[in-house]
Curated annotation (Swiss-Prot):
Record's protein name: Ribosomal lysine N-methyltransferase set11
Origin: domain of life: Eukaryota
InterPro entries to which the protein is assigned, alphabetical: SET_dom, SET_dom_sf, SET_MeTrfase, SETD3_SETD6_MTase
Entry GO MF terms: histone H3K36 methyltransferase activity; histone H3K4 methyltransferase activity; protein-lysine N-methyltransferase activity; transcription coactivator activity
Gene: set11
Keywords from the UniProt entry: Cytoplasm, Meiosis, Methyltransferase, Nucleus, S-adenosyl-L-methionine, Transferase
Record keyword Methyltransferase present: yes
PROSITE patterns in the record: SET
Functional description taken from the UniProt entry: S-adenosyl-L-methionine-dependent protein-lysine N-methyltransferase that trimethylates 60S ribosomal protein L12 (rpl1201 and rpl1202) at 'Lys-4' and may dimethylate L12 also at 'Lys-40' and 'Lys-41'. Overexpression causes a severe growth defect. Has a role in meiosis.
Residue sites binding S-adenosyl-L-methionine per the record: Y223
Species of origin: Schizosaccharomyces pombe (strain 972 / ATCC 24843)
GO BP annotations listed: meiotic cell cycle; methylation; positive regulation of transcription by RNA polymerase II; ribosome biogenesis
Amino acid sequence: MSNKQNIESEVSWVKSKGAFVHPSLEFSVIPDAGSCVLANNDINENTVLLKLPPNILINKRTCSRYSFRDKLTSFQFLSWLISEDVHSNLEISPYYTKALPQGFSFHPVTLTSDHPLWSILPDEVRNSLLERKNVMAFDYEQVKKFVSVDQPTFQWGWLCVNTRCLYYDTGSKNTEDHLTLAPIFEYFNHSPEAQTALINTRGTITIKSTRRIDKGEQIFLCYGPHGNDKLFTEYGFCLSNNPNISIQLDRFIEFDKWQQSFLQDHGYWNDYTCSLHGASFRTLVGVRTLLVSPSEKLNDASYDQTRRVLQYINGFSDGSRDRQDVEDYLKKVLQELLCEAEECKEKVKGISDGSYVFICAEQLWKDRIMCCQYLMEHSFE
């Protein structure tokens, strides 16, 4: 049975269990791009497109017969459940696992440290992937305490959950138990300009149109205001025109012990970013802290430069007196990042085999180039 046939069988099954699927939805498969949902007729604004009842959802509450489930996190339990269903046909939902991706070679979590792309990824992306790898390894060890499962199969199940889970109020006091998998819901792909809204209540999961959808349009959901770094590390894809680009500047900004102590004391240590909307407030505070000289005077709230930073932090000043110095400093930082990004983009192109993970890696560096160039021509505040 083809993947499209598996999806069609899954859609028929959820409808037989009480789900509402609008007749104008067409569940399709795009070659080399995966599944999607298309409109086979015009759809009006504020139309219910999908409504899933709780009896077809997959979470700790609906899969309660396993005695060890409460000894695992929902993520660990669902990862095992999905991977186990492949071998033993537990039928958590007929056709559900059959319609899942057969593999995740496109997902960067599967990259190894000797992969030629690994060392050319942006540092913050590589660190995020290492963190995800460590979480997956920890989850595998926890699951092995109760059941036997081989690592490749568990990794497949873990990535299925990682790329498909959503938050659904199960009624549990433990919010971690709200992690849920929803058959056919996952076929709505992500776009920051989605034509739909998700309505998530304890009774149902509902998707409604927020504008008119024309026949032939792909129907999207918005997973959140995520930049490509997040989309790549979590879901394994990037958008070529993502309005939510954010670049990390931490490794380009150095602080001495006085500056670090001041920023830690006031809750502004680390996580310095810029986006197409400008520099984050944290970043502007961090740079203003760097401008205080000598830095030992950061301990003296009456010192003029320190007082100005504190007034800026507390909203008593717009920081205009130091704005030009802040912009000059940030432009130097962005120039350094721009040079690195241009060099690394060319390195990725030079070793690319044309596969999707290389396309995404190049896009990550393109994001940085575009953001740096834009900000260097505009105000940061």
